[in-house]
Amino acid sequence: MSCGGSCNCGSCGCGGGCGKMYPDLAEKITTTTTTATTVLGVAPEKGHFEVMVGKAAESGEAAHGCSCGSSCKCNPCNC
């Protein structure tokens, strides 16, 4: 990382790991206690609609990250 842990690209402010959309929330997220509930059972097979919605979600902002490139710029700038 060539920019000392922070770089900015539009609304994307990359901090600590240079891949987080909102680096200031990282501390709040890591200190929050969460519990998980696992439900075991049988579910119907995914239909065409659910598959398409899942693919659309994967191609959105959540699927793209920023990494710190040269001159303190996010690379790629697609977050």
Curated annotation (Swiss-Prot):
Top-level taxon: Eukaryota
Pfam families: Metallothio_2
Organ and tissue specificity: Expressed in roots.
InterPro entries: Metalthion_15p
Keywords carried by this UniProt record: Metal-binding, Metal-thiolate cluster
GO MF term (any one): metal ion binding
PANTHER family listed in its UniProt record: METALLOTHIONEIN-LIKE PROTEIN 2A, METALLOTHIONEIN-LIKE PROTEIN 4B
Role this protein plays: Metallothioneins have a high content of cysteine residues that bind various heavy metals.
Family statement: Belongs to the metallothionein superfamily. Type 15 family.
Protein name per the record: Metallothionein-like protein 4B
Source species taxonomy: Eukaryota, Viridiplantae, Streptophyta, Embryophyta, Tracheophyta
